[in-house]
Every structure is written in C-alpha cells, then in structure tokens.
Curated annotation (Swiss-Prot):
Belongs to the UPF0502 family. It comes from Aeromonas salmonicida (strain A449). This is UPF0502 protein ASA_1460. InterPro entries: DUF480, WH-like_DNA-bd_sf, WH_DNA-bd_sf. The lineage of its organism: Bacteria, Pseudomonadati, Pseudomonadota, Gammaproteobacteria, Aeromonadales. Coiled coil: none annotated. Gene3D superfamilies: Winged helix-like DNA-binding domain superfamily/Winged helix DNA-binding domain (1.10.10.10).
Amino acid sequence: MELVLGPLEARVIGALIEKEICTPDQYPLSLNALVNACNQKSNREPVLELSELDIRAVVDELIRKRLVVNTAGFNARVPRYQHRFCNTEFGTLKFSEQELGIVCELLLRGPQTPGELRSRTNRLCSFDDVTQVDAALAALIEQGPYVVKLPREPGKRESRYAHLFSGEVDLQALAEASPASSYASPAADRLSVLEEEVETLKLQLQALEARLAQLEG
C-alpha cells in the first residue's frame, strides 16, 4: 500500500471513524471534540494526552494528504473535521460495516485477537460469532493486505492481528511493548464499553450547550 499513517495520524483517523459511527449527530467533529476523542481513556491503547496544537498539526498533515477535510464554511469560526480515509465517492478504500469496525478498532487499540475484536467492536458493528470476525479479517488480508496475522504469543490460544496502514509491523518493538490491553479481562472490556458511553454522553452534552449558547446569543 502507498498509504502510510504515522501513529498520531492513525489515532485521528480512528477517532473520526468511531465518532462518525457512534455519534453521527456530533459529526464532523470540532477541534475540541477531536482532541477529546483522541485522548479518550476508554477504547484507546495507548492512552494519550495530546494538546490542540498537537492535533491541529496532525490534522493539517492529513488534510494535505487528502485524508481529512474541513467541512465548515470559509468564514466559520469553528472548523469541523471529516475523514476521507475510506468509503468515499472517489476513494479507493471500500470496507463493509464489519471490516470498517475491525479497521477502526485496530487503528485505536493496536493488535488484537479475533475474540477481542468481536467484543470491542460491538459499538461499531455486530458479529454473530468469532467465525464472522475471522471471515472479515480474511477479506481484509485478501483485499490489501490491510491487516496481518501476527505470530502467536507463547501461552496464548489466539493470534493477534494488526493493521498495515502504518507500514510493516515491527515485531520486536511490539513484543517489548507488551500492551496490557492484550490481556484485558471480560470485566475490563465491559468497563471500557461503559466509559465509551460516558464519553458519548459528554459529547452530546457539549453539543447541546453549544446550541443553547447560539440560541441565547
């Protein structure tokens, strides 16, 4: 693939895709909402603390790459950002709902097993069983490849999968990182879902407050 995303670019694209699906009423995102989405504590690995300046620099580069567009009018005070990463009229990347859910989750949390992907993508799409996850992963490998199956870790029953939108996976660096998310329990995943719902409610509240301020003004 010619497309290569840096780590922060992958985070921004993943966050935009997630919010497009989960909170369409607040999408496209303002810069502040995008910062909050990128720094979200749930469904993120690693958790980051990026500033508006950090995100603006990343967004500017993604706009240059034609992967993000500001949909606000020229004279608008608040920019609104929308991704053009995939499933656009003139773009080459086309994913099904399930494939997009997997891609989004891999962009936001890094390598994961099919079982983890099934439980963690439930806010983005639905899988009846792990077999459907395997089929979607196989399609992503065949089409691109856009994902890769990693060597199974010692003592683990399932292999993890990683996206290839940031280039080839550095297996040594990945092994040294040993992210805790790879060992998350079902209870931790349920907590993550609840935290995501709280973040969604915060975004909805911010949107309501902004509308109220406009009416009062």
